[in-house]
Every structure is written in structure tokens, then in C-alpha cells.
């Protein structure tokens, strides 16, 4: 197995050929990019060939200096008139300390930050528009030890991505905590730029040093292993004790890719004309059927509702939990930790937890649309376009499989995790469409918001708006799309009566305090039951620091107070449609819906009576937890007999 393996004296060597060619019109950011990346990579442990013997390649980097000077941030002097004319400074960031670089043009190393692996080179002769410069580089990592994990290269199950290679430009890895910054006389860090920042719109939030690239990789590994990279296998051969694989992508991809190597078994299937494969450790076959089912379900949902799938294959590749408990979606390739799917013991009973081997698979496949077709600019809110919408797809697919009535535990889990995580926020919490990239916002809150929105305006209506949005921005060149673009597409299909949802869900931080106060029922002469419900609904907003307010102006809020109340209760002005539900039991004592309808609520305090055909057991206000309610435990109440 892959548990607790300790590997001594491991190293990885990369021989990389890279060609980037960019043409653009910088003033309007209507750039068209043609970038080619060809990689030759060796994955070795201590029985690898001699390091010198594996260094056989060169790296060529050709940029249009106009793009680099402005859009790619490779020039220290940011004066616009000068930046358009030449490049005289190159910035480079390294992941591994032992990274050796060599340019083919004379330069001086003017800054070497050995703590954060950031160098600045000044060219002795500046690059004019149309000039090119070659870069040769070799990357090594330190060997793993008994107490320190330095390398992602292991004896079985290697996984690393392109962050291991040098990157160009300013990385933006700055101190984020304002109190820490204050100690160094630094101003508060604003993190991501606003969507109005024209420079930031020239980059995706995934990569600042390239746009869409043509990708080809040759990877060597141990003779008994399979090496995998994005693209389609073109050639495989053995040379000495090394096994080689050549992959090539047939369409442009983001500058975002990974390499895997392991002693894999391979499970195969098909979805329409798409080849499906799962590369797994021999003893970890517990949930292959669930993961294969998840791939098919996600491909079905996304291709039906948004746009066609852009590749002819889709692969999941297992890696050891020592690299982390996550999955990551690259073009047609999804590295997937053993820890979150392959070795899970799934409880399919009513009381069981979520089938996360299926759920995570759907989420990662959804990224083939929401990240690899639609990619946001490097601005606030862009992770809503990738993570929130992928989570939304997961919830809708689970709803198709399990039915709407079983969605409460999924929604409540997301709600509770969001509410808990936001209490630990140290910097600021923005509204969803302007989030800073915090996981609890774009995962937990985002999934709730989009699921609720599909419930309010209709799943088909929402998906049609998203499909229209995909058609507009998929695979686009700079300037890249933003959350504002997507929200505008949703606004177009939202009825006037529900316009408040746009403000509550996307533009502000809005929370509810809904609760059932009292309920009782009585049997009528005709055999039906009258259910009386007293309940309260209120909502408020938070600013980025968590301060509560009830409206932009005094008249925007409403109050409720009785004679025996010391203080009134407040709410933002209400014209809200909220689910009211009444529930009974079937012959097996399982919950069934007797009544579920959205009622328009305009007051904090409410009393209603509803007639149902069967004996009621429980009532609920927003009973399925679709809204962001600060205490969902009081949304339901057993009926007083």
C-alpha cells in the first residue's frame, strides 16, 4: 500500500522545452495568444540514471515584449511609454531552491531572494518588440528524510504540477495578515484587484505568465510504472531501465498541468465516444464503480446543460494521501488522493454520511467546464465561477440520484460549515461575487446560493443562462470574464419579484434568522387536519468585518415589538418568498411532504393556518435549509398534539 512509506535519497530532474509566442494589441486587451509548451521530464528515485545524462534539452521562451511589459508583469519599470518599447528586466520565481537557470543573453542578477526564491535579472541589452530570449533550466528537489517531506517524488504514486517549474513575473506572494504587515510598516493588503482593474483582466487567476498553450510532454519514469500527463498518448517506449511516454493535447489548454507516475491498474469504460479511465493502486478498488458513475453523471449533466465536453478522454489518477487529501482537475486529467475516494468506506443507509467518492468526482469533472472552458480574470470573485459552480453541479447531480427530499443533509452540511468557518475569518469576508478566494465562501456558501437560486427561478432557467454565458466566454482571450458578467446573465432571467435574490445572494452578505415559534394541529370533521403555525422571519446584512445592519437607510428596515418585549426585533425590508413545509410519516415511519410551498413574507411575525390531508408530524420554515440561516436548528418543530 501507500501508507507510511519513507523514501530516502529521492530526486527529480526536469528537462523542459518551452516555447511561448504571443501576439496582441495591448491597448484594448483584445489579445490573441498562441503559446506552445513542450516538456521532457524525468521522474527518478535513487536508482535513476546519472543526473548529467538526463539533461539533454533546452528551454526556449519567446515573448512579445509589449505583452510582457504590461500584461505579464515582467518589467520593474512600469512607465507605460517605456514598457511598450522594450524589456530590460525579467523576474522569476522558483518553487525548489535548487533551480539552475541560464539565459542565452548577457544579464546581471540584481536581486536574489533565497528565502522566497525570487530573482530579478537585468538584461545588458534590452529586448525590443519582436526579440526573443532563451532560458535553460534544471530543477532538483532535496531528498526526503525520516522527519521531513521535501519531495513529491515517491516510490509509487508521484504527483506534482507545473508550480514545480520556474514562473515569470511577480508572483504576488505577500504577507496577508494586516497586523503582521503593520510590524513592517506595510499598508493593508487588498489581496485580489477589483473586477474593474484593466491590468488584472489581462490574466487568468490560474496563471500570470501564460494564457492558452499548446501542450506536449515526454515523461520518463521507472520501467515498472505508468507516467501520465494531460493530453493523448502518442508514443510509449523503453530505453535502458527507463520507460517513456509522450503525450500531446489536440487543443489549447490553460498553463496548468500535472505529472503522475505509479504502478497502476487501469479500469476502463466509455461515455458516448469519450474514453474513461481510472488509474488506481491494485488494492484500492473499493469505489471504482462510484467514481466511474460520478464521471458519467457529471459529463451528462454539464454537456446537456452547458456545452459539449471538449476532450475525447477523461482520466482519474490516484496519488498517496501523503501528498494531501484533495483532488485537482487538469485538462482531461484528474489526480485524486486515495484519502478522499479510493479507500472510503461509504455508508449507503439513510443515516450514513455523504458519498464523497461520488461527490468529489462530480465536482472535479465539472471543472472541465467551470475552469477549463470558463476561466475568470485575476480579480475578486473569480473562484465563484470555478468552485461555486462546480459545487452547484455536484449538488444537482446528487439531487438527480437521491431525490430532492434527501438534499437537506447536504445543504445543512454546507450551511453549518460556512457559518462555522466565517467565525475564524481574520481579514475580511466579501460578498460571494467579490470573494477573496476563501474556501468557505466559494465552496460552502457558493453551493448553497446556486442551489437555492435554481430552486427559486428554476433549474432549467438558471442553466440556460449559464449556457448562454459559457457560449459567450468559453476559451476566451484577454480581457477575461468576471463574476459580474455571470451575474448579469442571471439577472436577465430573474423575474422582477425575485430581484432581491441577486442582491441578497451575490452582491451582499445577507443572513436570515427564521424560526418556528409555535405549532399545533387539529383534526377536522372531514378527516383532514388544520395546522396552525406561528413563525418569525428576519434578515440582516454584514459588512466585511461582520458588523450587522438592517438597511442602507432607516426606512429600509422593519421592526416587531410587543408590550412584553424590552427591545424590538429588526429586519431588512421583507418581500421574500420562503418555503413553508408540513411533514407526516408513511407506513414505514419515513418522512413525507404533506405541504411545501413558497409563501410571500412581508412581516417579521407571522401566523398561518394550512389544511392537509394526512396527520401532520412536523412543520418547517425553510425546512430544507436553502437559505443562509444563522440557526437552522429552530427552523423545524414537532407538532403539539
Predicted feature descriptions by range:
Residues 8-76, 80-83, 498-504:
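N-terminal, polar/Ser/Thr-rich
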Residues 29, 38-46, 64, 71, ...:
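Extended, low-hydrophobicity, Ser/Thr/Pro/Gly-biased non-transmembrane segments
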Residues 59, 189-362, 392:
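Hydrophobic helix-coil surface modules that form long, contiguous segments used
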Residues 86-87, 92-160, 203-204, 599-615, ...:
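A surface-exposed beta-strand-loop module
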Residues 296, 301, 347-409, 466:
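Zinc-dependent metallopeptidase catalytic helix centered on the HExxH motif
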Residues 310, 439-530:
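Amphipathic alpha-helical substructures
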Residues 387-448, 452, 456, 474-478:
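Acidic/His/Gly-enriched intrinsically disordered linker/tail segments
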Amino acid at each position: 500500500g501507500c501508507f507510511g512509506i519513507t523514501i530516502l535519497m529521492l530526486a527529480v530532474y526536469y528537462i523542459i522545452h518551452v516555447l511561448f509566442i504571443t501576439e496582441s494589441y495591448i491597448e484594448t486587451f483584445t489579445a490573441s495568444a498562441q503559446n506552445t509548451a513542450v516538456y521532457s521530464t524525468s521522474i527518478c528515485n535513487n536508482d535513476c540514471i546519472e543526473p548529467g545524462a538526463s539533461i539533454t534539452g533546452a528551454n526556449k521562451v519567446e515573448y512579445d515584449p509589449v505583452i510582457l511589459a504590461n500584461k505579464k508583469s515582467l518589467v520593474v519599470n512600469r512607465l507605460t511609454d517605456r514598457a511598450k518599447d522594450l524589456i530590460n528586466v525579467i523576474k522569476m520565481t522558483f518553487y525548489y531552491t535548487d533551480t539552475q537557470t541560464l539565459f542565452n543573453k548577457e544579464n546581471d542578477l540584481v536581486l536574489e531572494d533565497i528565502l522566497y526564491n525570487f530573482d530579478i535579472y537585468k538584461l545588458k541589452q534590452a529586448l525590443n518588440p519582436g526579440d526573443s530570449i532563451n532560458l535553460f533550466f534544471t530543477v532538483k528537489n532535496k531528498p526526503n528524510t525520516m522527519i521531513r517531506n521535501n519531495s513529491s517524488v515517491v516510490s509509487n504514486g508521484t504527483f506534482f504540477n507545473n508550480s514545480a517549474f520556474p514562473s515569470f513575473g511577480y508572483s504576488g506572494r505577500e504577507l496577508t495578515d494586516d497586523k503582521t504587515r503593520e510590524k513592517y510598516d506595510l499598508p493593508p493588503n487588498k489581496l485580489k484587484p477589483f473586477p474593474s482593474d484593466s491590468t488584472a483582466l489581462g490574466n487568468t487567476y490560474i496563471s500570470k505568465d501564460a494564457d492558452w498553450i499548446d501542450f506536449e510532454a515526454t515523461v520518463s519514469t521507472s520501467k515498472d510504472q505508468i507516467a501520465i500527463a494531460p493530453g493523448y498518448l502518442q508514443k510509449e517506449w523503453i530505453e535502458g531501465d527507463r520507460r517513456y511516454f509522450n503525450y500531446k493535447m489536440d487543443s489549447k489548454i490553460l498553463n496548468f498541468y500535472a505529472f503522475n507516475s505509479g504502478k497502476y491498474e487501469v479500469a476502463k469504460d466509455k461515455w458516448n465516444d469519450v474514453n474513461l479511465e481510472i488509474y488506481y493502486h491494485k488494492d484500492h478498488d473499493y469505489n471504482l464503480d462510484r467514481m466511474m458513475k460520478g464521471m458519467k453523471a457529471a459529463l451528462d449533466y454539464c454537456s446537456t446543460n452547458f456545452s459539449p465536453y471538449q476532450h475525447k478522454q477523461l482520466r482519474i489518477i490516484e496519488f498517496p494521501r501523503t501528498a494531501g487529501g484533495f483532488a485537482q482537475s487538469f485538462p482531461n486529467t484528474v489526480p485524486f488522493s486515495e484519502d478522499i475516494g479510493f479507500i472510503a468506506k461509504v455508508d449507503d443507509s439513510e443515516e450514513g454520511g455523504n458519498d464523497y467518492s461520488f461527490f468529489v468526482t462530480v465536482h472535479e469533472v465539472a471543472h472541465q467546464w467551470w475552469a477549463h472552458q470558463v476561466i475568470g480574470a485575476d480579480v475578486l470573485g473569480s473562484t465563484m465561477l470555478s468552485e461555486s459552480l462546480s459545487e452547484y453541479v455536484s449538488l444537482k447531480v446528487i439531487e438527480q440520484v437521491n431525490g430532492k427530499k434527501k438534499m437537506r443533509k447536504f445543504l445543512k452540511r454546507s450551511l453549518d460549515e460556512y457559518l462555522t468557518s466565517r467565525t475564524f475569518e481574520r481579514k475580511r469576508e466579501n460578498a460571494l461575487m467579490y470573494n477573496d478566494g476563501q474556501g468557505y465562501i466559494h465552496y460552502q456558501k457558493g453551493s448553497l446560493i446556486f442551489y437555492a437560486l435554481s430552486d427559486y427561478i428554476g433549474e432549467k432557467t438558471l442553466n440556460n443562462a449559464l449556457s448562454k454565458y459559457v457560449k459567450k466566454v468559453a476559451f476566451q482571450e484577454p480581457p477575461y470574464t468576471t463574476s459580474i458578467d455571470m451575474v448579469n446573465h442571471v439577472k436577465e432571467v430573474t423575474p422582477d419579484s425575485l430581484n432581491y435574490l441577486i442582491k441578497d445572494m451575490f452582491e451582499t452578505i445577507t443572513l436570515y434568522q427564521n424560526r418556528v415559534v409555535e405549532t399545533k394541529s387539529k383534526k377536522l370533521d372531514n378527516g383532514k387536519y388544520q395546522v396552525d403555525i406561528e413563525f418569525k422571519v428576519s434578515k440582516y446584512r454584514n459588512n466585511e468585518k461582520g458588523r450587522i445592519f438592517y438597511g442602507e437607510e432607516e426606512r429600509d428596515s422593519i421592526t416587531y415589538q410587543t408590550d412584553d418585549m424590552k427591545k424590538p426585533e429588526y429586519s431588512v425590508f421583507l418581500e421574500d418568498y420562503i418555503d413553508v413545509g408540513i411533514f407526516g410519516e408513511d407506513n414505514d415511519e419515513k418522512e413525507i411532504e404533506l405541504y411545501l410551498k413558497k409563501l410571500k413574507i412581508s412581516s417579521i411575525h407571522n401566523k398561518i393556518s394550512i389544511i392537509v390531508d394526512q396527520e401532520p408530524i412536523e412543520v418547517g420554515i425553510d425546512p430544507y435549509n436553502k437559505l443562509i440561516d444563522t440557526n437552522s436548528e429552530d427552523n423545524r418543530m414537532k407538532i403539539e398534539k
